[in-house]
Amino acid sequence: MSNPQAERLVTFLIENGIQDQKVLDAIYLLPRESFLSQAMHHQAYDNNALPIGQGQTISQPYIVAKMTELLELQQDSRVLEIGTGSGYQTAVLAQLVDHVYSVERIKSLQWDAKRRLKQLDFYNISTKHGDGWQGWSSKAPFDAIIVTAAAESIPQALLQQLKDGGRLLIPVGDDEQQLLKIVRHGDEFLSSVIEMVRFVPLVPGELA
């Protein structure tokens, strides 16, 4: 069954430079309204970040697509997400790889996302309530790490949890934020600036 709103969104993403067909398909197939409150359903396929409670947001589809594309994922890529939030980005990733690990510092968001993802028949996702600054060392190393909140500086724990050749996508900064792509080469980390972005802050610690 076709979804005209999702088709319009995918057309918008293509017009704005998203080229990876697997990423476009993952976004087309995912019902974004399932990750939003009933009051937000009419905006589900707009290219906007929307509130999900606890001062957090679901990222705009463009930035989800852009960051996912930049991770250069293969089916067997080991992926860590920092900031589960609603679970939307998690679900996009889970359509592209065998397994996704995701850390969320706010317990209620983690539980809601876990329930929502199971309802949507995603069983290749492991979520954890914890401090995103620390990553998930027991599951490391990772081929790709994606951070969905802005850090004041790059968390060293995340760099150390990258495989050689692994990619880290992270927004860095306070009010003025840059989306960085960092690639590990042995003990060196090569960083490139992708574009200016606006994310909620990556706060250390965890909330019950």
From Swiss-Prot:
GO molecular function: protein-L-isoaspartate (D-aspartate) O-methyltransferase activity
Keywords annotated in UniProt: Cytoplasm, Methyltransferase, S-adenosyl-L-methionine, Transferase
Record InterPro entries: PCMT (IPR000682), SAM-dependent_MTases_sf (IPR029063)
GO BP annotations listed: methylation; protein modification process; protein repair
GO CC terms of this entry: cytoplasm
Pfam families noted in UniProt: PCMT (PF01135)
Coiled-coil residues: none
Superkingdom per UniProt: Bacteria
EC number: 2.1.1.77
Active site residues of this protein: S59
Catalysed reaction, written as an equation: [protein]-L-isoaspartate + S-adenosyl-L-methionine = [protein]-L-isoaspartate alpha-methyl ester + S-adenosyl-L-homocysteine
Keyword Disulfide bond: no
Intracellular or extracellular location(s): Cytoplasm
Protein's job: Catalyzes the methyl esterification of L-isoaspartyl residues in peptides and proteins that result from spontaneous decomposition of normal L-aspartyl and L-asparaginyl residues. It plays a role in the repair and/or degradation of damaged proteins.
Entry-linked NCBIfam families: pimt (TIGR00080), PRK00312.1 (NF001453)
Recorded family membership: Belongs to the methyltransferase superfamily. L-isoaspartyl/D-aspartyl protein methyltransferase family.
UniProt protein name: Protein-L-isoaspartate O-methyltransferase
Organism of provenance: Vibrio atlanticus (strain LGP32)
Gene: pcm
